[in-house]
Amino acid sequence: MSDIAITISLLALVAVIGLWIGHWKIRGVGLGIGGVLFGGIIVAHFTNQYGLKLDAHTLHFVQEFGLILFVYTIGIQVGPGFFSSLRKSGLKLNAFAILIILLGSIAVVLVHKIADVPLDIALGIYSGAVTNTPALGAGQQILAELGVPQTTVTMGVSYAMAYPFGICGILLAMWLIRLFFNVKVDDEAARFNAESSQDKESLHNISLKVTNQNLDGLTLIQIPGFSDEEVVCSRLKRDDMEIVPKASTEIRTNDILQLVGDDNSLAKMRLIIGHEVDAPTVAYSGEIRSERVVVTNEKVLGKKIRALGIHQKYGVVISRLNRAGIELVPTGNTTLQFGDVLHMVGRSDVLNQAISVIGNAQQKLLQVQMLPVFIGIGLGVLVGSIPFYIPGFPVALKLGLAGGPLVVALILARIGTIGKLYWFMPPSANLALREIGIVLFLAVVGLKSGGSFFDTLVNGSGLEWMGYGIFITFVPLIIVGTIARLYGKLNYLTICGLLAGSMTDPPALAFANEIKEDNGAAALSYATVYPLVMFLRIMSPQLLAVLLWAA
């Protein structure tokens, strides 16, 4: 067999063993996807003994491509809610993440000064303890420029010693915070869903009887509130007749209007129109029905609802719009994106025609448009390769192959649609690509660090380095995690994502996601802090090297 064939076969073996190890649980807690790393260490130990040669270029490619796949799909998943989360809680989350980095940097200074650990080894331990490979590369480059010899070897070995237990330190911190605060995961997930409006309707229906005499004879659009497009009138009942009103429909006293909107807007309309009645709000007569319709027609992507003329042509009202789990009041200026769910109300004989304009092709929701995937990955790699020059630093800083694809994916997922290209990815496809990516990445890291792992552990300073690594990993996490829970009042699942993001650690995020698989709290907080943290993690070893070298 060729070296490449042997390498691929061993990667598959590592994945099988690692995923099996990941399913082991002690008191309900297991390594999860992190087991692949230890599977790689075990396999690497035996391949080193038997002298099997692995292709270095193949390993390097698989590691980087796996990482790119993982962070890109994470960005696509959380992109629609990332920017709104940044406005609501981003400052607090990033402040906690910066505190973790600051405490970790102080720990490195203590290890170097008090324990008298050489600078190159201290920075290698730091990079492994915070599970950040770009930090390792940045530290090696600046130490080489400062004239420190053999940094690649010494930093690489110390990094390998600290990395596996760096992951364990994060998982241990999550577990201890859960035990210490007696966290009930289901309650935390329900609280997150309630706060993010994922498990409750942000819009409501009410039926108002027109008792304001001043409204008699006015058209619907002339009534204050409708012109602001904060409320939608989905139907009008007059005596025994029920219709879907248009903007030009005249309103009469004693008409009953069914309105859709948020609580504040509906309260204003109650003051303007009249009192609320107990008319049915969900049952529709035989002539009028409602449907939930998914936007799948490529011809309407990126277009405003007003431009489609749905209401003018068919007399159909779009009363609600659900995008990425968030319900909105649609207006004429709302731009449609692939996967938007519209609540449409109209006469049975014309509603199907209006639905055909929107699409509602369920099979399209199961398909992955591959062209946008590779456009996004390509743009992400380019962005990650752009150097940022900061005065006083001899080495240019970069987002790298992890940060670049993540930032681009967040932006593209937020944009949603460009022409006929859409960055919607079915959840099952997203999960499959994400799992494949993280398994490939961890398998290679395990194979690379496992060759000298046991020898350094038994005969060298491995245990000492591990101890320093656990100190650098665990102490900042447990301190900030406790503060975030006690004083920041953060959701436990959000804290788990924060801890994983502050260490730029995909395996820890995978573990956090597995705590409550159907909840996006951890992934959202991870993505909220990741871009800034990645930049600071790359910059911090360079800053530490300059400061400690000068001292």
Curated annotation (Swiss-Prot):
Keyword DNA-binding appears in the UniProt entry: no
Membrane topology: Multi-pass membrane protein
Main location: membrane
One GO cellular component term: plasma membrane
Localization of this protein: Cell membrane
Keyword annotations from UniProtKB, A to Z: Cell membrane, Membrane, Repeat, Transmembrane, Transmembrane helix, Transport
Pfam families referenced in this protein's UniProt entry, alphabetically: Asp-Al_Ex, TrkA_C
GO terms for biological process, alphabetical: potassium ion transport
Domain of life according to the entry: Bacteria
Gene3D superfamilies cross-referenced by the UniProt entry: Regulator of K+ conductance, C-terminal domain (3.30.70.1450)
Transmembrane region(s): 4-24, 28-48, 65-85, 95-115, 157-177, 370-390, 402-424, 438-458, 463-483, 492-512, 529-549
GO MF term list: monoatomic cation transmembrane transporter activity
Start and end residues of each RCK C-terminal domain: 191-275, 277-360
Family from the record: Belongs to the AAE transporter (TC 2.A.81) family. YidE subfamily.
NCBIfam families attached to this UniProt entry: PRK03818.1, YidE_YbjL_dupl
Protein name from the UniProt record: Putative transport protein HI_0035
Organism of this sequence: Haemophilus influenzae (strain ATCC 51907 / DSM 11121 / KW20 / Rd)
Lineage: Bacteria, Pseudomonadati, Pseudomonadota, Gammaproteobacteria, Pasteurellales
